[in-house]
Amino acid sequence: GDGWGQRAPYVAKLIQYHEFDIFGTQEGKHHQLEDLKAMMPEYEYIGVGRDDGAQGGEYAAIFYKPERFELLDSGNFWLSEDTTQPNKGWDAECIRVCTWGKFLDKLSGNTFVHFNLHMDHIGVVARAESAKLILEKIKAFPEKLPVMLSGDFNVDQLNESYLLLQNSGILSDAYTTADMVYANNGTFNAFQPDAMTEERIDHIFLSPEFKVKKYGILTDTYRSPADETDTV
């Protein structure tokens, strides 16, 4: 089956095998995030439930290794006309939240900001306006720091809201800038590992300060960790 109880150990093992230092998650609920944290004690996470700003509903959580990164600041805002509290924006079907963290890389001494989100699966206007909102938030950040934006954008690489980010002059899809790309499939599998698609709906955007050595869409598990494929 595809239940969380069956998938959770393989999610944790996949993460630990690849030794991700920092990563964004989507659709995780509080108990699922706590399960992962218990199985991966080397990680901490930040984020809130989208429904109440506490523990209710899905998170757009960011996991990180405190051994590698120091969390300097963090926050959350909603993908809506009112970013300050849980509410649906524009024509969205669901409440959507974005979590961000400001991190110090203890190895390099560099500081950066990581935004992580899950855009609406129905609202066309909501997705485009969410992309514009993210760019506004980046521009309004009090310090000009390198930026990472990860998430489930619910659109592929040809869609308007993707192109708003890709052509912004602020961010670029890591797929397009990496020295090496390992992507033998798209990122949506609907729990069917043999499904093939050219569509990438999960993206990692980076500001120009980042040098991308490798980009990968990981399919290396017999049991699908999720209905979308890990993007690194």
Mark where each language-model region is.
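Active-site-proximal beta-strand/loop segments in catalytic clefts of secreted hydrolases
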Residues: 1, 26-29, 48-51, 65-66, ...
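Glycine-rich, highly charged phosphate/nucleotide-binding loops
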Residues: 2-14
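Active-site beta-strand/loop signature of hydrolases that rely on acidic residues for catalysis
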Residues: 11-36, 63, 101, 111-117, ...
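Extracellular/periplasmic catalytic domains that process cell-envelope and extracellular macromolecules
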Residues: 16-17, 38-39, 53-56, 91-95, ...
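Metal-dependent phosphoester/phosphodiester hydrolase catalytic core
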Residues: 93-95, 105-128, 132, 141
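Metal-dependent phosphoester-hydrolase catalytic domains
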Residues: 125, 129, 138-147, 155-232
